[in-house]
């Protein structure tokens, strides 16, 4: 029982940490949904100017370890941003680690979500979409009623 009493001494810090974890997870989920949907729609588009960057994004991001991307974006992004601000004569900018974590989680998980969404969209039988067109549904209605 002595092991649990030590946790009570740090309950405020543990609760703050749990809230930061929830903030990071939920914010990262929202960012990853945005990246995932945009990359999915881009990778399925007929225009190569939209398709090729989306495919490159999902392939490259899923191929590089998450921790490497975190370090590259946090430290490399900080360095590049401050090199730019110094060149422009602006003051030094510090990037908040929490916001960097939210962005990196969203950026990385967005690539995985894009492939999951793309697989889901491609799994829809063509007959369902043809039937919706024959029924007279608009492309937007087909997307919301059948695809999504």
Give each language-model segment a name.
Residues 1-148:
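Transmembrane alpha-helices and adjacent helix-loop boundaries
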């Amino acid at each position: 029982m002595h092991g649990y009493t030590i946790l009570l001494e740090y309950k405020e810090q543990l609760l703050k940490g749990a809230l930061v974890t929830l903030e990071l997870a939920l914010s990262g989920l929202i960012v990853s949904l945005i990246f995932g949907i945009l990359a999915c729609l881009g990778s399925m588009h007929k225009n190569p100017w939209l398709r090729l960057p989306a495919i490159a994004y999902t392939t490259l991001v899923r191929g590089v370890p998450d921790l490497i991307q975190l370090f590259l974006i946090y430290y490399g992004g900080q360095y590049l941003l401050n090199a730019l601000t110094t060149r422009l004569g602006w003051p030094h900018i510090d990037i908040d680690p929490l916001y960097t974590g939210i962005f990196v989680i969203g950026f990385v998980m967005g690539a995985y979500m894009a492939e999951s969404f793309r697989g889901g969209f491609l799994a829809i039988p063509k007959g369902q979409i043809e039937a919706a067109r024959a029924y007279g549904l608009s492309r937007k209605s087909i997307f919301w009623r059948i695809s999504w």
